[in-house]
């Protein structure tokens, strides 16, 4: 029996994911389930609870073990995935302490990113010390939600980044190119345009690195943002577990691909279970 809490994927039995605790009926069904499907953005307690009963799609282990942009940096390092030189700070007081001890920053301009937030929110290009301290003071109001932030050098590139979307065993790519004067972020929500097949060689390089990351982590539903420097070196920027679907052909196309890949994943799980039962 396949149990789904994700409206986009129909199971043998389907529910909306509850806000609080699962009902006795739902828990009883979990105990019978061969597989459980969850929405890609859910609470950690729901995810870990479901995993106690059956294999879960999507795999969100890394999302909860390595949260936010800070967590992504640690994950990239462990997996041997290239990323920009990065300084990690766990709050403004730590930043001030390390500066007082003589730690040097990158040369201006550099990029400051609060660990949380998506769509380019809380990502700033800093051109001088005055701008830096103005931005850090803005972060102060968000410290209760998580104080960590990172600083990375600004890498010269062609104002485009590549998004590699992982859906099960499928790896789909598209470029986001920023053509708005004065805007350095390549988010579609900030005016970037979507293009396809701009550089197949770089796209294949990015897919190979993404496959390596997925093999090491189990990630099977996420979008990777990757930048290429002027000399074509790849740098992974972040992992998006919730992502827009416009570049994939829209909602309906995404739903079709998702259901195809979930079906493949379920068949793989059931096949492995059959092998174990024979052994």
What residue ranges belong to the model's regions?
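Phosphate-binding site of ATP-dependent enzymes
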Residues: 124-213, 217
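Short strand-connecting beta-turns/loops that link adjacent beta-strands
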Residues: 117, 169, 229-232
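A short glycine-rich, hydrophobically flanked beta-strand micro-motif that places a catalytic Asp/Glu
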Residues: 152-153, 219-231
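Conserved N-proximal alpha/beta basic substrate-recognition cap immediately N-terminal to
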Residues: 2-90, 100-101
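Active-site nucleotide/adenylate-binding loops and adjacent lid/helix of ATP-dependent enzymes
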Residues: 1, 63-149, 204
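Short glycine-enriched loops at secondary-structure junctions
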Residues: 39-43, 62-63, 177-180, 227-231
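Protein kinase-like catalytic core scaffold
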Residues: 110, 150, 172-173, 222, ...
């Amino acid at each position: 029996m396949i149990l789904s809490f994700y409206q986009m994927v129909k199971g043998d039995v389907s529910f909306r994911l509850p806000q609080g605790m699962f009902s006795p009926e739902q828990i009883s069904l979990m105990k019978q389930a061969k597989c459980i499907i969850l929405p890609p953005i859910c609470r950690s307690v729901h995810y870990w609870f479901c995993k106690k009963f059956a294999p879960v799609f999507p795999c969100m282990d890394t999302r909860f073990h390595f949260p936010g942009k800070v967590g992504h940096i640690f994950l990239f390092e462990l997996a041997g995935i290239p990323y920009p030189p990065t300084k990690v700070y766990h709050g403004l007081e730590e930043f001030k302490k390390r500066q007082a001890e003589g730690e040097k920053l990158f040369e201006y301009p550099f990029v400051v990113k609060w660990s949380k937030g998506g769509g380019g929110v809380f990502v700033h290009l800093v051109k001088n010390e005055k701008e830096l301290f103005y931005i850090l003071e803005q972060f102060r109001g968000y410290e209760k939600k998580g104080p960590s932030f990172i600083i990375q050098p600004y890498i010269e590139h062609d104002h485009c980044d590549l998004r590699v979307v992982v859906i099960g065993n499928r790896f789909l790519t598209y470029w986001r190119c920023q053509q708005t004067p004065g805007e350095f972020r390549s988010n579609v929500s900030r005016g970037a345009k979507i293009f396809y097949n701009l550089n197949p060689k770089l796209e294949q390089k990015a897919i190979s690195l993404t496959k390596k990351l997925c093999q090491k982590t189990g990630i099977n539903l996420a979008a990777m943002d990757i930048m290429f420097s002027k000399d074509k070196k790849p740098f992974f920027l972040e992992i998006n577990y919730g992502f827009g679907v416009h570049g994939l052909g829209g909602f309906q196309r995404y739903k079709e691909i998702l259901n195809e890949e979930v079906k493949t994943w379920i068949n793989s799980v059931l096949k492995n279970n059959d092998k174990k039962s024979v052994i």
